Amino acid sequence: MVDIIFNSSFLGDMGDHSKKKSGFAMCVGCGSQIHDQYILRVSPDLEWHAACLKCAECSQYLDETCTCFVRDGKTYCKRDYVRLFGIKCAKCNLGFSSSDLVMRARDNVYHIECFRCSVCSRQLLPGDEFSLRDEELLCRADHSLLMERTSAGSPISPGHIHSNRSLHLAAEPVTVRAPHRNHVHKQSEKTTRVRTVLNEKQLHTLRTCYNANPRPDALMREQLVEMTGLSPRVIRVWFQNKRCKDKKRSILMKQLQQQQHSDKTVSIFSLQGLTGTPLVARSPIRHDNTVQGNSVEVQTYQPPWKALSEFALQSDLDQPAFQQLVPFSESGSLGNSSGSDVTSLSSHLPDTPNSMVPSPVET
């Protein structure tokens, strides 16, 4: 971006800053002091004469109304900068507009129409497997045919065979990025980030090392660089992403377990709409029929007259009927012996009602 700044030294010696050499504005283009009324400043701290700030290709003057790019100490307008340093299609070598969708294969970028097999000219769609050999795209069928011919023909180095056998998966088309502004101190920066594709052998080596130690030290990373052929930065980023994915996965599993436990608890408490304390059923045990407490002996109370009546009834049943008759004398009176027996028997019995005591019969 170009900014216009008022030059205070243009008004003459009105302060101490105009007398100091450090306060003088120096033009980056011609190297002389700027005495103009206005200074054109390019971010962050490059100052120019209005007549010196122009495109190095088309000599178009650059001001605050246009975009200015700086590369290798030269200034360019947007059109020439994109034409010279912008991203180009690896097939047709033409540039991209901001609305174009592109396909990527390693460091190469293609138009959707240019993303085709170089042998059969079949367009590669998202999800198709392809290979990149000598900057040429090959579909899966042509890649297999080429490998068969190569193995049957002249021998080649094992490393070359390994590099050509890896197949890639075509991804969805993405929007091409506009080139970023490059300043003098950021000349070596790339305008795009390229996704690194790993083959099965490299992934197996990295996963084996990760299972043994998720945080390898510098010595282990150097060994992985030699074993996989990847850069140290790619290996470091792969381990960081792997740890992050595993952490997210563990957090998700923990949340699912807690959710299942809470759902199970709620289903127990709210069975048929009732709430209460959860109980745990135990194993069955034998029922103990004993009664707690001290045993008390119960005795039956019988009145004396009831015992006498039972005794009399029992004696009547035991004796014959003729013995129950009272003997009479020939004179018609009771004998003395019988009267005395009755008297003596009544004296030994307890008090009973009068109806139970026999009386002498007068004749």
UniProtKB/Swiss-Prot annotation:
One of its GO terms (cellular component) is nucleus. InterPro entries: HD, Homeobox_CS, Homeodomain-like_sf, ISL1/2-like, ISL1/2-like_LIM1, Znf_LIM. It comes from the Eukaryota. This is Insulin gene enhancer protein ISL-3. Residues 191-250 bind DNA. Keywords: Developmental protein, DNA-binding, Homeobox, LIM domain, Metal-binding, Nucleus, Repeat, Zinc. Residues 27-80, 89-143 form the LIM zinc-binding domain. Residues 328-363 are annotated as: Disordered.
